[in-house]
């Protein structure tokens, strides 16, 4: 009997050029997951040695490039939010709040929400470039920054194939925040002065994002433990890791907010996330 032949994994070109197929995308992501670990390690190594290399060099003048970079991410986030948020509200109005993070509906299989949800996950790879701008411009790379970028990237990639329903909230919140945040950073890159409350507002909406996420994850833990919503699309491995991740984000950003705006040690500093 001839051995069964295994079909080759789908490629990035397949996902981008062929009609949307969740099976095809999952096939591609199965090969991208191991690569994501290598990318994360390369990212951390580049930060370390990049700072060493820049220690005795003049900072690069990347003002216009950085502005375009941030405007690009703001535009991408705005378009993705426009494509994904209406579906969230549709499920919310039709089936209620709990259903919006328990029921998948056709979130992953629909050609529009499926593609833009996947595009969001993949965007976390180029977002790592935010840190390279800090390194090349000899700006501080604080723990909160690289920890958030690295962990969000790997978590998004590794958990994609789980097709969790709560992702519609995670993506909607993150994209809404990033649309505003990256636009702000683009404006600041051009040395355009903004009122101090704007920076405070950016950090505040980041914290609100994590508060909402922590609430949803907390409720999902209760739902999963009591099996109060049969068929709720959430798994323990994703829930436990994601819950700890969001709690750590909330702690770090709240601590930053306290130091930057309550203790008033850094009058012009704002946090930059993914």
From Swiss-Prot:
Q: Which EC number(s) does UniProt give?
A: 2.3.1.-
The disulfide bonds in this chain are none
Give the membrane topology, semicolon-separated if more than one: Multi-pass membrane protein
User: Which Pfam families does the UniProt entry name for this protein?
Assistant: ELO
The answer on whether this UniProt entry bears the keyword Transmembrane reads yes
Q: Please describe what happens when the gene is knocked out.
A: Suppression of ELO-2 causes an accumulation of palmitate and an associated decrease in the PUFA fraction in triacylglycerides and phospholipid classes. This imbalance in the fatty acid composition results in multiple phenotypic defects such as slow growth, small body size, reproductive defects, and changes in rhythmic behavior. Suppression of ELO-2 decreases growth rate and reduces brood size.
Per the record, what are the reactions this protein catalyses? Answer: hexadecanoyl-CoA + malonyl-CoA + H(+) = 3-oxooctadecanoyl-CoA + CO2 + CoA
Residues annotated as transmembrane: 29-49, 73-93, 115-135, 140-160, 170-190, 201-221, 238-258
Sorted alphabetically, the Gene Ontology BP terms of this entry are: determination of adult lifespan; fatty acid elongation, monounsaturated fatty acid; fatty acid elongation, polyunsaturated fatty acid; fatty acid elongation, saturated fatty acid; lipid metabolic process; multicellular organism growth; regulation of gene expression; reproductive process
Q: Which UniProt keywords apply?
A: Fatty acid biosynthesis, Fatty acid metabolism, Lipid biosynthesis, Lipid metabolism, Membrane, Transferase, Transmembrane, Transmembrane helix
Cellular compartment(s): Membrane
GO CC terms in record? endoplasmic reticulum membrane
Name of the molecule in the record = Long chain fatty acid elongase 2
């Amino acid at each position: 009997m001839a051995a069964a032949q295994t079909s080759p994994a789908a490629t990035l070109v397949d996902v981008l050029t062929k009609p949307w197929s969740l099976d095809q995308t999952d096939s591609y992501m199965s090969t991208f997951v191991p690569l994501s670990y290598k990318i994360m390690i390369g990212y951390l190594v580049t930060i370390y040695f990049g700072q060493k290399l820049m220690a005795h060099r003049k900072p690069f003048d990347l003002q216009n490039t950085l502005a375009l970079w941030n405007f690009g991410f703001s535009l991408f986030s705005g378009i993705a939010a426009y494509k994904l948020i209406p579906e969230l509200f549709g499920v919310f109005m039709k089936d209620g709040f709990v259903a919006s993070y328990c029921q998948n509906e056709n979130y992953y299989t629909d050609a529009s929400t499926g593609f833009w949800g996947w595009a969001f996950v993949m965007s976390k790879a180029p977002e790592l470039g935010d840190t390279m701008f800090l390194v090349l411009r000899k700006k501080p790379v604080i723990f909160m920054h690289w920890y958030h970028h690295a962990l969000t990237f790997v978590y998004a990639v590794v958990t994609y194939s789980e097709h969790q329903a709560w992702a519609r909230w995670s993506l909607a919140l993150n994209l809404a925040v990033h649309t505003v945040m990256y636009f702000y950073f683009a404006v600041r890159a051009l040395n355009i002065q903004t009122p101090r409350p704007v920076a405070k507002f950016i950090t505040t909406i980041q914290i609100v994002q994590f508060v909402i996420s922590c609430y949803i994850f907390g409720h999902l833990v209760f739902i999963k433990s009591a099996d109060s919503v049969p068929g709720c699309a959430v798994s323990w491995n994703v829930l436990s890791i994601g819950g700890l991740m969001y709690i750590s984000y909330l702690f770090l950003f709240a601590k930053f907010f306290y130091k930057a705006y309550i203790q008033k040690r850094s009058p012009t500093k704002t946090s930059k996330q993914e």
